[in-house]
UniProtKB/Swiss-Prot annotation:
This is CRISPR system CMR subunit Cmr1. GO terms for biological process: defense response to virus. Keywords: Antiviral defense, Cytoplasm. Part of the CMR ribonucleoprotein complex, consisting of crRNA plus Cmr1/Cmr2/Cmr3/Cmr4/Cmr5/Cmr6 at 1:1 and possibly 3 Cmr7 dimers. A Cmr2/Cmr3/Cmr7 subcomplex without crRNA can also be isolated. It does not cleave target RNA. Disulfide bonds: none annotated. InterPro entries: CRISPR-assoc_prot_TM1795, RAMP_III_fam. Belongs to the CRISPR system Cmr1 family. CRISPR (clustered regularly interspaced short palindromic repeat) is an adaptive immune system that provides protection against mobile genetic elements (viruses, transposable elements and conjugative plasmids). CRISPR clusters contain spacers, sequences complementary to antecedent mobile elements, and target invading nucleic acids. CRISPR clusters are transcribed and processed into CRISPR RNA (crRNA). The CMR complex degrades RNA complementary to the crRNA (target RNA) within UA dinucleotides, generating 3'-OH and 5'-phosphate ends. It is found in: Cytoplasm. GO terms for cellular component: cytoplasm.
């Protein structure tokens, strides 16, 4: 029998929830926030927290698949039904429904038909959508939409990451020799829709997350410990993570509006949530958050699981061809600042823009801290994530030398470009009782060397400069 275990009323700040295609919405589903995304992220943060506790208590790390096997009673697996089901109820007005109508394209088509092949560019200036043909002819486009572009355009234009992504939606080459008028119209309409849709970014999305527990399933030993550990990892995910794209750059950060507990199994987590405001007043938030991550209570749950079901776990080792992430006690929360949100939320948008513009080797903060370019690029490659490389030789030898010497274990240098890597240095916008904070923290990884005092100092100074 399925019963409601716990409910969270959550708020996401500037979530980019369109998925793989970089849109604000996805053609395959209408929901702005999906239970499957939440559950996938929850499972990932559960792996992070389990390895965090394991590294503190045993100095060991475990593979993600073996951690999933240990927690399959909670999250389910290919052959086992999940004991928990998530339900997401989005508040009215928080959806990303996009409408576009009455698009006037006749003048553009007439201009295009006079030529064989033309490149068409879109731009939005002075609240007017303009089509520019091969850099000469500029035609204003009349249209109707439910989207207030003026409300969000400054965030998109001033944010280096967003403005770069927008380039992929603003131009197309049309061969008018093989395209009749209706085909051209359809191509142009798709171009305009994709371009305008990129501006469909909500300042905030509020939703209720209901967690249901199926009590009819025959749970194996230590189920309560597993569930309580998993609920703790959900709390860490909410406090330090987010939904959608670019969460490491501050977008989509989650905050708790309120919480309800309907079963004794969630009593401890409910107590932590309720006490956060009073704890924040007694202690600095930079103390409260690590206390939650490195809680003695979850260490007890960890010990119970290790003592009884360690046979399910497989140790991660230096021969592995993948990385795992975890927190370390030496360096985790780097910097927390209160955000001034007095003027139309500009404080939050300014922070988001600054984070995106600074988190690269060409950012002013890193230039001020690390004068030598190759050393600076090595630092960025080690801590700020990277795209996938075709091979390691795409990296300059001098950068590799600094990576070997300071940041990355030599045996993993050949693997750091194998897949796209997460940024270890992450930023999160968190709201507590109508006060907004920007948090910078370090999520460590198995490919990184133990940080010396100089590297720690650079990380702290860099976070201080950015926020």
């Amino acid at each position: 029998m399925e019963e409601l275990l716990m409910s969270f009323k959550l708020k996401a700040i500037y979530p980019l929830t369109g998925g793989y295609n970089r849109h604000s919405i996805n053609e395959f589903y209408e929901e702005n926030v999906r239970p499957t995304e939440i559950k996938g992220l929850w499972r990932w943060w559960n792996r992070v927290l389990f390895n965090t506790v394991s590294y503190v208590k045993e100095g060991k790390l475990y593979t993600y698949d073996s951690i999933d096997r240990l927690f399959e009673d909670v999250f389910g697996s290919e052959n086992k039904k999940s004991a928990v089901r998530l339900e997401v109820i989005t508040d009215e007005g928080s959806d990303n429904h996009f409408e576009l109508s009455n698009v006037e394209l006749d003048n553009v088509i007439d201009c295009l038909k006079a030529n064989r092949e033309e490149k068409v560019n879109l731009d939005f200036r002075d609240n007017t959508l303009i089509i520019e043909i091969e850099g000469s002819t500029k035609i204003p486009i009349s249209f109707k939409s439910n989207l207030d572009i003026d409300k969000i355009k400054d965030l998109v234009y001033k944010n280096k990451l967003l403005s770069f992504e927008l380039l992929g939606f603003k131009s197309i080459k049309i061969d008018t020799k093989i395209s009749d008028k209706e085909v051209i119209k359809e191509i142009l309409r798709d171009l305009i829709t994709n371009y305008l849709e990129y501006f469909n970014i909500k300042q905030e999305v509020t939703f209720t997350l209901n967690i249901y527990l199926d009590k009819s399933l025959k749970h194996k030993q230590n189920f309560d410990a597993k569930l309580k550990f998993a609920l703790h990892s959900l709390l860490v995910f909410i406090l330090l993570g987010g939904i959608g794209r670019k969460t490491s750059r501050g977008f989509g950060g989650l905050s708790i509006v309120n919480a309800e507990c309907h079963d004794g199994l969630c009593g401890e987590i409910y107590g932590i949530v309720n006490n956060m405001e009073s704890e924040k007043e007694k202690k600095d938030l930079a103390t409260v958050l690590p206390n939650i991550i490195f809680s003695q209570t979850i260490e007890q749950y960890f010990s119970e699981l290790i003592n009884n079901e360690s046979y399910k776990l497989r140790s991660w080792n230096n021969n592995s061809d993948f990385f795992v992430y975890y927190f370390i006690k030496d360096i985790n929360i780097l910097r927390i600042n209160r955000i001034d949100t007095n003027v139309n939320r500009n404080g939050i948008e300014n922070i988001l823009n600054r984070i995106s513009n600074e988190l690269s080797a060409s950012g002013n903060c890193l230039k001020d801290l690390i004068m030598q370019e190759m050393r600076r690029r090595a630092f960025a490659l080690a801590f700020l994530g990277n795209r996938k490389f075709r091979n390691i030789h795409e990296i300059y030898p001098r950068i590799l030398e600094f990576l070997y010497a300071n940041y990355i274990k030599r045996e993993f240098v050949n693997l750091i470009g194998k897949e796209r890597r997460l940024s270890n240095l992450r930023f999160k916008i968190l709201e507590i009782n109508n006060t907004y904070y920007i948090i910078s923290y370090l999520l460590y990884s198995s490919y990184l060397k133990d940080p010396n005092s100089s590297i720690k100092d650079t990380l702290y100074q860099f976070a201080r400069c950015v926020i």
